[in-house]
Design a protein with these regions (language model features):
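Structural signature of the two symmetry-related core transmembrane helices
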Residues: 79-94, 284-300, 378, 382
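Transmembrane alpha-helices of Major Facilitator/SLC transporters
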Residues: 256-279, 289-296
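Conserved MFS/SLC helix-loop-helix module at the cytosolic interface between two early adjacent transmembrane helices
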Residues: 62-100
Length: 400
């Protein structure tokens, strides 16, 4: 009796196109960071305008995160992810076609946020289910985090290099991302769908659990730490590099991309550490993350005061670690507090609080006329100490 032939492993793992979609979404979301240096120096745009354009991503991102999961349930994971990739490509093509128009850049940032929200929400579900179908459920979260982190860090670094060394610094990086998104769109065409969707069914956002969102641990532990997630990251790679741009003459876009890549790479590495630090009866991981963020803010204040490139890099490492720890610990807290039926909506509330940190560069740019940046960053550290005290005070007395 002849042995039955073994089935050959697929040349491309089924989860890889979904991971590539997450990376492409992250790339598009963060390519603006080094381009902001070009807008400030070559286009002579006011720092407040550049901060507004950076923040324009947020009003598109949050609805995308909220609706992406329900849309994927209704229409299918692959269809929603592919539509998001197409929108992401168009969102990059728009500012490339009208790079000197703030309105076009703003519209592109807004559309990029929508595309990223849908791609991240639906793409994470798709990747998890593809990994589960291959018997690798335990690897899903790690693969999703690495794919998204690689896109965020790689997009900033690549855009910085393209803007630094090649012509058309405000257009070429956007066109490269648009081409990448279309390539990933083609790759996802043959990836397996994990759910057929429920055509005709209304979008269901999931119920709110009052017991969860009103729980003292959510109110006094999770929420006070949440703005530090992206507040830390954006201070590191949006606020600090321009403050020392005169110390790297001619290399501002590249330096901005390097700092962004460093910050986000450290954040990806730090997220698993939150699992090790996490404790069922304390908020140890959250507290360590907040202390790290406060330290990063103080080092950033010193960097701004002394125009020190080296201290900006040190601050980026600390703020990146704080970003990763506070993000990871917040997700762990949400997973413990929320019942499965309310997990998506509770996670969205946490995400909304975390993404409020994206407003930090705009708030600092607006208030920079009233106080110098070293004082503003020190003030942020003081606010962080207050939040740290609140979180530490209520963490032991309010176990989940």
């Amino acid at each position: 009796m002849e042995p039955s032939p073994t089935r050959a492993a697929p040349a491309v793992p089924p989860w890889l196109p979904a991971g590539a979609a997450l990376a492409a979404a992250g790339w598009g979301a963060n390519q603006f960071t080094p381009l902001a240096a070009v807008y400030r120096t070559q286009e002579q745009w006011h720092p407040v305008l550049v901060a507004v354009l950076f923040t324009a991503y947020l009003p598109g991102l949050l609805p995308g995160l909220l609706l992406g999961g329900p849309a994927a349930d209704r229409f299918g994971r692959r269809r929603v992810v592919r539509a998001a990739l197409l929108l992401s490509a168009a969102a990059s093509a728009l500012p490339a076609a009208a790079a000197s128009s703030p309105a076009a850049v703003c519209a592109g940032r807004l559309a990029t946020g929508v595309a990223a929200g849908y791609a991240l929400s639906a793409g994470n579900r798709w990747l998890r289910e593809l990994c589960a179908a291959a018997g690798r459920s335990g690897a899903a979260e790690r693969r999703a985090a690495y794919a998204t982190g690689a896109g965020l860090a790689g997009g900033a670094l690549a855009a910085g290099m393209l803007a630094e060394w090649l012509p058309a610094p405000t257009a070429l990086p956007c066109l490269v991302h648009a081409a990448l998104a279309l390539l990933v769109l083609a790759a996802t065409g043959r990836a397996p769908e994990t759910t057929g969707g429920t055509a005709g069914a209304p979008l269901r956002l999931g119920g709110w659990c009052r017991r969860t969102v009103g729980h003292p641990r959510f109110v006094w532990v999770v929420l006070p730490a949440s703005p530090a997630v992206f507040g830390a990251a954006t201070v590191a790679y949006v606020v600090l590099p321009p403050l020392v741009a005169d110390e790297v003459p001619g290399y501002a876009p590249l330096f901005s991309g390097v700092v962004a890549a460093l910050t986000l790479s450290v954040g990806v590495v730090a997220q698993p550490l939150a699992v090790r630090l996490h404790h069922a009866r304390t908020a140890r991981a959250t507290l360590v993350g907040m202390v790290t963020v406060i330290g990063g803010l103080l080092v950033g204040a010193l960097a701004a005061y002394g125009d020190s490139v080296a201290l900006v890099l040190v601050a980026a490492v600390l703020l990146g670690a704080g970003y990763g720890l506070t993000l990871g610990s917040g997700l762990l807290e949400i997973a413990r507090l929320a019942p499965p039926s309310a997990l998506p909506s509770t996670a969205f509330l946490h995400q909304g609080a975390a993404y409020s940190g994206f407003l930090t560069p705009l708030l600092l740019a607006v208030t920079a006329g009233a106080a110098p940046y070293p004082a503003l960053l020190t003030g942020m550290a003081v606010v962080g100490l207050l939040c740290l005290w609140v979180t530490a005070r209520f963490s032991r007395g309010n176990p989940p």
